[in-house]
């Protein structure tokens, strides 16, 4: 019923896996675990270990960054079509441009001496490096925005990173909900920014309609994508129905107002539900 040709899957417990179904799933390579690489033995909030998935950790910053680069290149060769970062569940999305010296300090300290500032500097540095690597290997970078630990997880926290990495494609998942106005403030200024309506119609029908209305009026149709962001087949179909209802409601209103023709609306449906994703994830 969903009529999907391919599904981009995020197997966060086994990053970069196609879940054993390559005919259906194309992986995004989730990189959150690598933000724990400043010390051995750490696990994320889901109990997943970086070392158990990717082996022994390098013990210095330069080798660590190259190690991350190696894994990204390998996962791309295995079929990954995107990188993904969902660190908004763990921390702020305000990633500062820190120096190498600031970032590598954490490798020289005993675990008992490591501060939150040391961890932040390491993670900030790594995020900027990942943005550079994403451009080098031509993989879009999906960023979970909005919901999570909700302190500084709005889209504007990423403004400086997006501005200074013009060759990196930033796919902003969930459009920063509930702070969707942040998206409107910068989407027109960055050709490398792609709004993604994933999850949004389930979170808020009203917000999803508002976002689509405004993005259509801002001529962003060629950049919008949608995804279900669900676990099961039943949930995925329900998510698709919710999005169809929201999108059709928006297009009907735009046609009734004389803003769009029926052919314009059909073109928008094709782009959001198929064409745009095909151009981004190539």
State the predicted function of each range.
Residues 60-85, 92-193, 207-225, 242-246, ...:
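Histidine/acidic residue-rich metal-binding segments in metalloenzymes
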Residues 1-17, 22-36, 81-88:
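Divalent metal-dependent hydrolysis catalytic cores, especially in the metallo-beta-lactamase
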Residues 35-64:
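A gly/proline- and charged-residue-enriched helix-loop-helix capping module
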Residues 234:
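Family-specific functional microsites
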Residues 12, 30-36, 86-90, 146-148, ...:
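Active-site beta-loop-alpha junctions enriched in small/polar residues
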Residues 221-222, 237-282:
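Mid-to-C-terminal alpha-helical segments outside catalytic/metal-binding sites
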Residues 197-203, 226-228, 261-267:
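A generic structural motif
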Residues 27, 193-198:
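Short hydrophobic/aromatic-enriched beta-strand-loop microsegments
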């Amino acid at each position: 019923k969903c009529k999907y040709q391919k599904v981009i899957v995020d197997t966060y417990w086994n990053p970069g896996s196609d879940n054993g179904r390559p005919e259906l799933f194309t992986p995004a390579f989730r990189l959150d675990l690598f933000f724990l690489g400043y010390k051995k033995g750490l696990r994320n909030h889901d109990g997943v270990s970086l070392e158990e998935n990717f082996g022994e950790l390098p013990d210095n910053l330069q080798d660590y960054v190259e190690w991350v680069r190696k894994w990204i290149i390998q996962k791309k060769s295995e079929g990954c079509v995107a990188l993904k970062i969902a660190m908004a569940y763990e921390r702020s999305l305000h990633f500062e441009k820190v120096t190498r010296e600031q970032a590598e300090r954490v490798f020289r300290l005993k675990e008992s001496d490591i501060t939150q500032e040391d961890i932040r500097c390491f993670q900030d540095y790594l995020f900027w490096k990942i943005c550079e690597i994403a451009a080098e290997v031509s993989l879009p970078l999906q960023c979970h925005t909005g919901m999570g630990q909700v302190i500084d997880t709005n889209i504007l926290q990423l403004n400086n990173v997006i501005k200074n990495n013009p060759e990196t494609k930033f796919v902003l998942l969930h459009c920063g909900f509930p702070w969707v106005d942040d998206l409107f403030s910068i989407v027109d200024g960055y050709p490398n920014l792609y709004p993604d309506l994933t999850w949004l119609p389930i979170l808020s029908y009203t917000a999803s309609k508002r976002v689509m209305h405004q993005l259509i009026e801002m001529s962003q149709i060629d950049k919008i994508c949608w995804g279900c962001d669900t676990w099961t087949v039943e949930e995925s179909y329900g998510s698709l129905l919710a999005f169809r209802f929201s999108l059709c409601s928006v297009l009907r209103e735009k046609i009734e107002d004389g803003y769009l023709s029926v052919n314009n609306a059909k073109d928008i449906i094709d782009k959001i539900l198929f064409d745009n994703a095909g151009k981004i994830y190539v």
